Amino acid sequence: MSDANLDSSKKNFLEGEVDDEESVILTLVPVKDDANMEQMEPSVSSTSDVKLEKPKKYNPGHLLQTNEQFTAPQKARCKIPALPLPTILPPINKVCRDTLRDWCQQLGLSTNGKKIEVYLRLHRHAYPEQRQDMPEMSQETRLQRCSRKRKAVTKRARLQRSYEMNERAEETNTVEVITSAPGAMLASWARIAARAVQPKALNSCSIPVSVEAFLMQASGVRWCVVHGRLLSADTKGWVRLQFHAGQAWVPTTHRRMISLFLLPACIFPSPGIEDNMLCPDCAKRNKKMMKRLMTVEK
């Protein structure tokens, strides 16, 4: 029986010892593991960082940017103090727009609008007795004048362009016919022949009342169309050719004139000399030719 009690006491002691050991293991082992992990993690991370990181190159731009980041706030803190209100308002061309706005803010006025509007608002509220010193050549006035000048120049250029285009169109619409001397002579003969076959009534017409057909004798010379040269003007019978219905007419009496059948010379006089006259001999020859043509027709 004593042996049985001894065995039971040993068994209880061993169970208690086992319980104590298990309790010790359960309480101490996790604490040691956590401490070891905490000690190992920084060492591992530090070694990995050292292995993975590469040496950075020197970048002066990065340093300048960093310096600007540090210096920019310091500059932003330095604010220029507003100028106090002057006793006399300076002219608009001697003060900037920001200064005018600061003065308006000091007086509680609106700062909206152009520079000239802000200036006039400040003058009206703070300096009503002072005479307005508004120079003509302010910035706004210069801009307005420049715009007006630009518009005037544009309008003038447009008118000049349209005028040149009209002149060019007129030049294109004008047809200039240049005929040689033989060609002109043949054309004149053709016209004369066409008139010759017409009746006398068509080769004769009345002279207008206000026309000076017969010329008086004078000293000097006159240009004869048929001869193509200057002849003496002191002879009687010089006539001035008349142009009617697209052809030339020779006065025969003070009331009648007949067609020109003589061929004009292809020679032109000097400038300033009248070239629409017929000498007495040519006037007589033209009259005789008219009679012959009418006789042949009969």
Curated annotation (Swiss-Prot):
Quote the tissue specificity entry. Answer: Expressed in embryonic stem cells. No expression is seen in 5 months embryo, mesenchymal stem cells, embryonic fibrocytes and adult tissues.
Q: Where is the SAP domain?
A: 92-126
Instruction: Provide one Gene Ontology biological process annotation.
Output: system development
Segment Disordered: which positions? Answer: 36-61
Question: In its keyword annotation, does this UniProt entry include Transcription?
Answer: yes
Keyword Transcription set for record: yes
Q: Which InterPro entries match?
A: Dppa2/4, Dppa2/4_C_dom, Dppa2/4_central_dom, SAP_dom
- An example Gene Ontology cellular component term from the record? nucleus
* Swiss-Prot/TrEMBL keywords: Nucleus, Transcription, Transcription regulation
PROSITE patterns xref list: SAP (PS50800)
Q: Which GO terms describe its molecular function?
A: chromatin binding
The record ties this protein, via PANTHER family, to:
DCR DOMAIN-CONTAINING PROTEIN (PTHR16073), DEVELOPMENTAL PLURIPOTENCY-ASSOCIATED PROTEIN 2 (PTHR16073:SF10)
Instruction: Describe its assembly.
Output: Interacts with DPPA4.
Task: List the protein's name.
Answer: Developmental pluripotency-associated protein 2
